[in-house]
A protein has these predicted regions:
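Hard-cation-handling environments
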Residues: 187, 201-239
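Acidic, metal/ion-coordinating pockets
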Residues: 1-201
Length: 239
């Protein structure tokens, strides 16, 4: 994240699935690097306080941008309870809108981005794992909604908000573009657009490849290590 110079990172369900030993360490590493690790819908069961940061404010070309991040609201159903001991995952509705309103009132951002590790869904309003369309259809005062979890690379445009699915495995990058007309410090008009950009593997960043060569080899060695022998037939078909 530091190498990529990310402005913020939102936690996914797999981060929590790995347990406190992993995501607590990740949060501390991000903190040392000055990168906000966001999951505003995770609260402690002992005192009701938020476990991770909800959002951050960054400046881009003189424009104040609010970035709010959330993990999947249905995490508890996706992993063993020991992985999230002492924590509770809140629904993104109406929480995200409440947070957006609070951020806009306190920080007065000119652009608002919500990053949520939730599937797009069908807008059925009753599926905690798939709240993307529910958010898109209800959020006010948000320019971009970035979704994940279902590996979709869809782009859905509305009059005042655009949903960008981030895809999977680094195969696609969601690119959002916004044009602002600012007068006297106030935005008088804005144009939103977005697209999903495919990554071409024949154009590899060799500098990054060299920078992470040791880490790549360590993971490769671990992944290829022998754990045991299976003597019975296995079926790879999904049920």
């Amino acid at each position: 994240a530091a190498y990529m110079k990310y402005d913020a990172v939102a936690a996914g369900h797999c981060d929590f699935e790995a347990g406190h030993g992993v995501y607590d360490r990740a949060a501390e590493t991000f903190r040392k690097e000055g990168i906000p690790f966001l999951a505003g819908n995770v609260v402690r069961t002992d005192n009701g306080k938020r476990y991770l940061q909800t959002g951050t404010i960054v400046k881009k070309n003189g424009v104040k941008v609010a970035i709010l991040g959330y993990t999947n609201a249905d995490n508890a159903a996706l992993m063993d309870k020991s992985a999230y001991s002492g924590l509770e995952f809140k629904s993104l509705i109406p929480l995200v809108q409440e947070d957006v309103d609070a951020f806009r009132k306190k920080h007065k951002p000119q652009v608002v981005v919500v990053v949520a590790h939730t599937a797009i869904g069908k807008g059925e309003d009753n599926n905690a794992e798939k709240q993307g369309l529910d958010l898109l259809n209800s959020l006010k005062g948000v320019d971009f909604l970035v979704t994940a979890h279902d590996h979709s690379s869809k782009v859905i445009k509305r009059d005042s908000i655009v949903l960008v699915g981030c895809g999977k495995s680094g195969q696609y990058v969601g690119l959002g573009e916004i044009k602002l007309l600012v007068k006297g410090g106030k935005v008088v008009s804005r144009e939103l657009d977005a697209k999903s950009v495919g990554i071409k593997y024949d154009n590899i960043d060799t500098a990054m490849e060299e920078a992470f060569e040791n880490e790549f080899n360590a993971v490769k060695a671990f992944s290829n290590s022998k754990l045991g022998t299976v003597k019975k037939d296995m079926v790879s078909r999904e049920f």
